[in-house]
């Protein structure tokens, strides 16, 4: 059955490696629908704004509700989660009784020119998501190191065939995970 997958890129940079990886997901699988969920225009989280929620936040939350699952594709900054992504997750967690990510299936992918493939950031993101009662794809980690050697930076496309295969396998596992989430609730 066709699934609707939301893609959240944890980088604001227009041509970020992670945005290129996210775009490649849409090209590697045409049997599912992919929807970009942008976090660029979200204001900094502030509980005072919950009285009159900004339209950008309302649209962001609605986009999350409208998909079957979310894949977060994020870089790692200073061995941690990018601030813009943490801000988006904070908005998605509030108010707690109607948190849009609660019980939603989420997968994590990260790409970096370094050698550890966003391992530290993914640990932190996973910790935040688990505190939000999100169903994070267990066991499967998609850590893409040396990403600058795996893409064509002029064409803005993933060229490494092994990484493409890994992404296809990861996506297959994620879709399978979505199908089994109801059994967990």
Predicted regions and their residues:
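N-terminal beta1-alpha1 ligand-phosphate binding loop
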Residues: 2-31
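Secondary-structure boundary/capping motif
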Residues: 14-17, 45, 80-81, 117-118
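A general structural signal for well-ordered alpha-helical segments in protein cores
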Residues: 18, 22, 57, 85, ...
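A generic structural motif
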Residues: 30-35, 134-135
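N-terminal beta-loop-helix "entrance" segment that forms/cooperates
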Residues: 39-56
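Helix-loop-strand module that forms the ligand-binding subsite of alpha/beta enzymes
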Residues: 54-133
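Glycine-rich phosphate/pyrophosphate-binding loop and the adjoining helix
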Residues: 135-185
């Amino acid at each position: 059955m066709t699934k609707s997958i939301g893609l959240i890129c944890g980088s604001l940079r227009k041509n970020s490696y992670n945005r290129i990886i996210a775009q490649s997901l849409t090209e590697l699988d045409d049997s599912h629908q992919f929807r970009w969920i942008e976090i660029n225009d979200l204001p900094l989280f502030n509980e005072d704004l919950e009285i009159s929620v900004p339209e950008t936040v309302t649209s962001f939350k609605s986009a999350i509700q409208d998909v079957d699952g979310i894949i977060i594709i994020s870089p790692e900054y200073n061995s941690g989660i990018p601030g813009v992504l943490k801000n988006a997750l904070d908005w998605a967690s509030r108010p707690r009784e109607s948190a849009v990510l609660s019980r939603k299936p989420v997968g994590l992918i990260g790409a970096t020119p370094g050698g550890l493939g966003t391992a530290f950031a993914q640990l932190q993101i996973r910790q935040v998501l688990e505190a939000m009662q999100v169903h994070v794809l267990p066991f499967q980690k998609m850590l893409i190191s040396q990403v600058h050697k795996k893409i064509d930076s002029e064409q803005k496309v993933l060229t490494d065939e092994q990484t493409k295969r890994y992404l296809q396998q990861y996506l297959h596992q994620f879709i399978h995970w979505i199908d089994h989430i109801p059994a967990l609730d």
